[in-house]
Design a protein with these regions (language model features):
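Intrinsically disordered, low-complexity Ser/Thr/Pro/Gly-rich regulatory segments
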Residues: 1-50, 55-391
Length: 391
């Protein structure tokens, strides 16, 4: 039986912004703010928060920690940086590693509310991959001010020097690295980088693909330095989802991504192409959003007796499509709809360009004015079942 799920909404302005970006990319069905465990519930009747935001999609889990620590501009930059870094990054990492361990050890003890009355609806097992993201705030303007003293025109994102661990980052203002190289990689994103990534890579497949590729090149020590997250993103997009190809670099070599890659990318045809893909695939996004909202509100019509996992599995197939594939599917749907006469029943089968062998069946079914809407829906369901069997 499907049950209404009310997700958390964040406790701070920065958390609310993070949730907004995440909902645009992952939709509510896979994005859960303020997830709790039942630790301490027996004593206080309130659970303990595990993460600020938990994204669970297919076999990937992304744990977000959000910190809104003020950077003291009145202090010496090195002193101010160290204080900010300890509270924003090191404390976030501690929270992330703790959340990762708890989720791995006790996935059945996760809840979407602090009263621990509604379990996290997606089942987690030991086959899931974990990605950790530390979201920092209030650092973009100080970073610009600091780097402008070296050279005017620097970007607002932190510099990535990946060989630096947490202790070494403390000694290098506005630089972040692979802070705990012996643990799960932590993506450290300032507010500028977060907005950029979740705007440019606003599908689950595209965003997770970027995290995987970045983790690969850093942990293989192929990428040593990047002038900013936007420069790494530019390399990823222009490299067709590969930041640094193994074919162009030796086994013992590391590369640097210089400043200016993102600005250069925005002048290319590829950038305009990606914008067109987004505009042309809004239909598919809306389709997923509508399904997601209906499932979370338990308003699915005839199928409310079916459990959450079955609904999620079906809609997940729609959401697994990349931006390019969504454009292609949307284009085919709208083209068929445009050429279909209102009184005719027709269909079109379209193959996913992401997953060869995975097909979508679009059925265009006119409403007989003699039928009630309820009867029309029943008839429509029977026809789609029949078409699917033939397909």
């Amino acid at each position: 039986m499907l049950r209404k799920i009310i997700r958390g909404s964040g406790f701070t302005q920065s958390e609310e912004k993070l949730i907004e970006f995440a909902d645009d990319a992952f939709f509510g069905l896979w994005s859960y703010p303020n997830v709790y465990s039942d630790e301490g519930y027996s004593k206080n009747k309130i659970g303990k928060e595990v993460s600020d935001l938990l994204v669970i999609f297919d076999k990937d889990i992304i744990i977000f920690s959000d910190k809104a620590i003020t950077y003291n501009k009145n202090k010496d930059p090195k002193v101010a940086w160290q204080r900010w870094f300890k509270k924003s990054v090191i404390q976030s990492c501690t929270q992330l590693f703790g959340a990762e361990k708890f989720i791995k050890d006790h996935p059945e003890r996760l809840f979407v509310d602090k009263k621990c009355s509604v379990n996290l609806p997606i089942k987690i097992d030991n086959s899931f991959n974990f990605h950790l993201v530390a979201v920092t705030n209030n650092i973009s303007d100080p970073a610009i001010s600091y780097f402008d003293k070296i050279e005017k025109g620097s970007s607002a994102t932190l510099v990535n020097i990946f060989p630096l661990n947490a202790h070494q980052c403390l000694e290098n203002p506005f630089c972040v690295g692979d802070v705990y190289p012996d643990k799960t990689f932590v993506h450290i994103l300032d507010e500028t980088a977060l907005k950029l990534l979740l705007t440019e890579l606003n599908t689950a497949t595209d965003f997770i693909g970027y995290l995987n590729e970045k983790e690969r090149v850093v942990r293989e020590r192929t990428l040593l330095v990047s002038a900013g997250e936007e420069e790494t993103l530019a390399a990823y997009i222009m490299g067709d989802k590969t930041i640094i190809s193994k074919e162009i670099i030796g086994n013992d070599q590391g590369m640097t991504i210089p400043e200016g890659e993102w600005k250069n990318y925005k002048t290319t045809f590829n950038y305009q192409y990606q914008l067109s893909m987004k505009k042309g695939s809004v239909f598919w996004d809306n389709l997923i959003h509508n399904f997601s909202t209906s499932i979370l509100s338990a308003n699915v019509g005839f199928f409310s007796e079916i459990e959450f996992s079955t609904h999620e599995l079906g809609v997940r197939e729609l959401a697994k499509e990349s931006r390019q594939s969504r454009y292609y599917l949307s284009k085919n749907f709208k083209e068929k709809l445009k050429t279909t006469q209102p009184h005719l029943r027709t269909s079109r089968m379209v193959e996913s360009i992401d997953e060869p062998g995975k097909f979508y069946l679009f059925l265009f079914f006119p409403n007989d004015s003699k039928l009630s809407y309820s009867d029309y829906r029943i008839q429509r369901i029977s026809y789609i079942n029949a078409y699917a069997e033939v397909a």
